[in-house]
Amino acid sequence: MLTKPLQGPPAPPGTPTPPPGGKDREAFEAEYRLGPLLGKGGFGTVFAGHRLTDRLQVAIKVIPRNRVLGWSPLSDSVTCPLEVALLWKVGAGGGHPGVIRLLDWFETQEGFMLVLERPLPAQDLFDYITEKGPLGEGPSRCFFGQVVAAIQHCHSRGVVHRDIKDENILIDLRRGCAKLIDFGSGALLHDEPYTDFDGTRVYSPPEWISRHQYHALPATVWSLGILLYDMVCGDIPFERDQEILEAELHFPAHVSPDCCALIRRCLAPKPSSRPSLEEILLDPWMQTPAEDVPLNPSKGGPAPLAWSLLP
């Protein structure tokens, strides 16, 4: 049976389609209100906010112009940051429930403001694991399957994320589902090797460490192996470059042989030995019957439901 998330939550009512060109600061202030700081990253700063017409809660990513690493044409007359173009591509036609959606974007004198959906309550997977420790194989399988399906969608739209890690997985605590966020390190998908990498080094594959080049698909699978290890073990397997090159894995006793085997497949030192995304979903460990994800968004809140997996 194929492990695959069911249809995700519907789009917020009245969600606008991003315009072909970014609007200016005055237009932003007429439509949205900027709220408190949520976090800072290498490519921008993220604030809470809301839409004035209906008070829809959103995340607003502010990117200084000098932090834009790549540009892309949206039309014959409009050029935008590559991150906007990538989000536009993965969000076209309703997007995917496992990928964060770009609702709007604006260009200011200082840079760009990206308005993104913001499920509430939510927590990134790094904080979730830090708080709870190893997730157990049931929740890990559920979240991991959703992330793999989200990446499949991105690749089908010609987009490679290039920074798959726990901090870039947002957990919707009410629904028990995972969303891929932050395409700041992303690129257009192609078959030729990539010779640049702006992602997180401890998630990077050995071929990048040794040769400073990699292919999109096996590098993505490597980072998925790191992510799954993090979920079931509570921490990443490698910290130093030499550890990445040696790829020597040690598992706690509670991790099942089937789970260990899938992680070892994903973290094969030779890129051609790693499975495809489709093969990951067909792996015996991924075929284990699904179970609900035990989340606790807040005291007194409704019991969240995990996405089921199709038989």
Curated annotation (Swiss-Prot):
One of its GO terms (molecular function) is protein serine/threonine kinase activity. Its EC number is 2.7.11.1. GO terms for cellular component: cytoplasm. Residues 7-21 have a biased composition (Pro residues). CDD domains: STKc_PIM2. Induction: Down-regulated in response to enterovirus 71 (EV71) infection. Pfam families: Pkinase. Proto-oncogene with serine/threonine kinase activity involved in cell survival and cell proliferation. Exerts its oncogenic activity through: the regulation of MYC transcriptional activity, the regulation of cell cycle progression, the regulation of cap-dependent protein translation and through survival signaling by phosphorylation of a pro-apoptotic protein, BAD. Phosphorylation of MYC leads to an increase of MYC protein stability and thereby an increase transcriptional activity. Residues 32-286 form the Protein kinase domain. Belongs to the protein kinase superfamily. CAMK Ser/Thr protein kinase family. PIM subfamily. This is Serine/threonine-protein kinase pim-2. The active site is at D163. GO terms for biological process: apoptotic mitochondrial changes; G1/S transition of mitotic cell cycle; macroautophagy; negative regulation of apoptotic process; negative regulation of cell population proliferation; positive regulation of autophagy; positive regulation of canonical NF-kappaB signal transduction; positive regulation of DNA-templated transcription. Autophosphorylated. Interacts with MYC. Residues 1-25 are annotated as: Disordered. ATP binds at L38, G39, K40, G41, G42, F43, G44, T45, V46, K61. Highly expressed in hematopoietic tissues, in leukemic and lymphoma cell lines, testis, small intestine, colon and colorectal adenocarcinoma cells. Weakly expressed in normal liver, but highly expressed in hepatocellular carcinoma tissues. Keywords: Apoptosis, ATP-binding, Cell cycle, Kinase, Nucleotide-binding, Phosphoprotein, Proto-oncogene, Serine/threonine-protein kinase, Transferase. It catalyses: L-seryl-[protein] + ATP = O-phospho-L-seryl-[protein] + ADP + H(+); L-threonyl-[protein] + ATP = O-phospho-L-threonyl-[protein] + ADP + H(+). The gene is PIM2. SUPFAM superfamilies: Protein kinase-like (PK-like).
